[in-house]
Design a protein with these regions (language model features):
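Charged, low-complexity surface segments at secondary-structure and domain boundaries
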Residues: 40-48, 76-78, 154-165, 217-218, ...
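Modules that initiate DNA replication and primer synthesis
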Residues: 9, 14-17, 24-25, 114, ...
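Signature for HUH/AEP ssDNA processing cores
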Residues: 1-113, 122, 194, 206-208, ...
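Metal-dependent DNA replication initiation modules
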Residues: 1-3, 9, 17-18, 64-65, ...
Length: 261
């Protein structure tokens, strides 16, 4: 793990430690009760602690040798393809030329069966549900990098390794979709199948943090997972907060509230 962490840093991929997986359990204090095992930061400020300093990275790895590696997105933009739904959404957007271009940039398979496509950084917001199962991770967001361990027992793994494939520019056609001003999410469906109607929530011009923090607590009390809550708050923030909070602020709200649930 250390060798890969040092490679990422040497090649300009800003990283920070995320909690790891040991014996099918998160290394955080919640252990097997963690609702986002192996995916959340093991530093106080999360992506803001990301570093390219090999000394810092060695220190992190020595402190928690089981830590996963998290990429602080921004200088690198990631297309997050969530399982079969995401694959189908992406395929519906592709022609032969687009598909061929995507095959030239680094790609990793996630431990949960999805994919991450890595591109040169571009000015674009973090987007949850740009299309069903398709998210964009940019500044303020993060993804877990190979060879980190997933709760499934599988490791994240590159099938197009950045040691051989250079980061390509973020596709213009995908950027156009990402910057479309039309609402991208009207409903978020929780894993339980329960829909959250975004349009039923009034516009939040002020007290955004308090409103989203209150909603976050309600969702935790209803037994929702960190992933569900993050997706819901991101969608509400994008569609109903005027102006929207930074993605890092949403992440901070979720992790702050999660300490009490």
């Amino acid at each position: 793990m250390l060798d890969w962490a040092l490679w990422f840093a040497h090649n300009g991929w800003p990283i920070f430690p995320a909690h790891g997986i040991v014996d099918r359990s998160c290394t955080c204090r919640k252990g097997p009760e963690c609702s986002s095992p192996g995916k959340h930061p093991d530093t106080r400020r999360g992506w803001k602690d990301a570093s390219l300093d090999p000394r810092q990275i060695r220190e992190w790895c020595a402190k928690n040798p089981h830590a996963n590696i998290a990429l602080a997105c921004g200088n690198i933009t990631v297309l997050d393809i969530d399982g079969e739904k995401g694959r189908q959404s992406l395929e519906s957007l592709l022609d032969d030329d687009r598909a061929a271009y995507l095959r030239t940039t680094p790609r990793a398979r996630t431990g949960g069966g999805g994919w991450h496509l890595f591109f040169q950084g571009v000015e674009v917001k973090n987007l949850v549900g740009m299309k069903p199962g398709l998210d964009i991770r940019s500044r303020g967001g993060h993804v877990i990098l190979p060879p980190s361990m997933h709760i499934s027992g599988k490791r994240y793994a590159f099938d197009r390794c950045p040691t051989k494939h250079k980061l390509q520019k973020f596709p213009k056609w995908l950027l156009k979709i990402a910057k479309d001003d039309k609402p991208r999410i009207q409903t978020v469906t929780l894993l339980s199948g329960e829909p959250v109607d975004i349009d039923s929530i009034p516009v939040i011009p002020e007290y955004r943090n308090n409103t989203l923090t209150s909603l976050c607590g309600k969702l935790f009390r209803r037994g929702r997972t960190v992933e569900e809550i993050s997706a819901t708050l991101m969608a509400i923030n994008e569609a109903r907060c005027k102006p929207p909070l930074d993605a890092s602020d949403i992440e901070k709200i979720v992790w702050s509230v999660s300490r009490y649930h």
